[in-house]
Amino acid sequence: MELGAAARAWSLLWLLLPLLGLVGASGPRTLVLLDNLNLRETHSLFFRSLKDRGFVLTFKTADDPSLSLIKYGEFLYDNLIVFSPSVEDFGGNINVETISTFIDGGGSVLVAASSDIGDPLRELGSECGIEFDEEKTAVIDHHNYDVSDLAQHTLIVADTENLLKAPTIVGKSSLNPILFRGVGMVADPDNPLVLDILTGSSTSYSFFPDKPITQYPHAVGKNTLLIAGLQARNNARVIFSGSLDFFSDAFFNSAVQKATPGSQRYPQTGNYELAVALSRWVFKEEGVLRVGPVSHHRVGEKAPPNAYTVTDLVEYSIVIEQLSEGRWVPFDGDDIQLEFVRIDPFVRTFLKRKGGKYSVQFKFPDVYGVFQFKVDYNRLGYTHLYSSTQVSVRPLQHTQYERFIPSAYPYYASAFSMMVGLFIFSVVFLHMKEKEKSD
């Protein structure tokens, strides 16, 4: 009986091993919320690009009563895609507060809206420093619309010059013009974390396309955001697109040409390339940095001392890596600075790349106390990189001071001259004999 039970246990273990291997090999868990499941077919190219990169997609309607992002204090997914602009209430235990908590926990969120936008997406945008225009409004441009739009001029042809100058976010390859049809956004001017990824042209504005303009539009000119992004202080990333059609197969495969006479016709839009680049950035496949080993020591030594001494000549080195194609590779940057800080920086210098690490040699200031080697690297499109190493710097010991200090030579001269003068005066005073007066 015992041998039979052991055999069954081993058989069960061998059956479970492939399943465990599949679980271990699974990619980032991504929840996709849709207005309806037909969007899986109309936006199949975008979802296929995610699957080809190893993402595990879970499709659900936005009002599904079984929806859940957090269970027992743990996040069930790594990423969230919201392709349900018209949702009025999320299902299950998902709401704007839950999504905000997900972002605060470091989760990545991709949101696509449209002219039929509901209150939940509007509230989520407000939480992230983005304000959507009213429902049923659209971005209108009477000078930069596609030739196929002969009515309301809401099918916008966005030039690549209006893209954010950040290859890490929008990609490094040149793009064809972008097709856009959707709602406009404006950024909170008091929120420095918002990124204007794609803006409208100077002739664009956001209003009701079927009504005459009776008041100043919500967004005008370059202030009209078509695609916006956010990188929070905890490196969580969010992207808002005012157009759900931007990610559709129809827009990916469509030809594009401005309606202005003499404009060039392109056989395909740049939507697919831009959408892939944005998804790579927001889901942290691009622009992710990390700190590797950090070392510091006196020049000529290999290990750090218990305490440094003022005016020591030291060497500091740090390894910085970048995530590329799923692997950590050395980061290539020429603007990384090191600060040697007590309260304020006493030394600020550039780090030079040597092999797979960045290093620099410098001399400590003639000030003692508790200092920090600090690298604080914050660049557009990259995660915030921070490294701090605390060290003690003591004054010189009595035996370490110079015998004679050059700057004190005048005082030495005055002291010795006083001694010589006193000696001469004493000799003269003691040996001088007054002449006797004669009668």
Swiss-Prot record:
A single cellular component GO annotation: oligosaccharyltransferase complex
Lumenal-side segments: 27-410
Pathway: Protein modification; protein glycosylation
Protein name: Dolichyl-diphosphooligosaccharide--protein glycosyltransferase 48 kDa subunit
Record's function text: Subunit of the oligosaccharyl transferase (OST) complex that catalyzes the initial transfer of a defined glycan (Glc(3)Man(9)GlcNAc(2) in eukaryotes) from the lipid carrier dolichol-pyrophosphate to an asparagine residue within an Asn-X-Ser/Thr consensus motif in nascent polypeptide chains, the first step in protein N-glycosylation. N-glycosylation occurs cotranslationally and the complex associates with the Sec61 complex at the channel-forming translocon complex that mediates protein translocation across the endoplasmic reticulum (ER). All subunits are required for a maximal enzyme activity.
UniProt source species: Sus scrofa (Pig)
UniProt cross-references to InterPro entries, sorted A to Z: DDOST_48_kDa_subunit (IPR005013), OST48_MD (IPR055459), OST48_N (IPR055457)
Cytoplasmic membrane side: 431-439
Residues in the signal sequence: 1-25
Membrane-related topology note: Single-pass type I membrane protein
Sequence intervals crossing the membrane: 411-430
Family the entry assigns: Belongs to the DDOST 48 kDa subunit family.
A GO biological process held by the record: protein N-linked glycosylation via asparagine
Assembly description: Component of the oligosaccharyltransferase (OST) complex. OST exists in two different complex forms which contain common core subunits RPN1, RPN2, OST48, OST4, DAD1 and TMEM258, either STT3A or STT3B as catalytic subunits, and form-specific accessory subunits. STT3A complex assembly occurs through the formation of 3 subcomplexes. Subcomplex 1 contains RPN1 and TMEM258, subcomplex 2 contains the STT3A-specific subunits STT3A, DC2/OSTC, and KCP2 as well as the core subunit OST4, and subcomplex 3 contains RPN2, DAD1, and OST48.
Signal is among the record's keywords: yes
Keywords from the named record: Endoplasmic reticulum, Membrane, Signal, Transmembrane, Transmembrane helix
Localization of this protein: Endoplasmic reticulum membrane
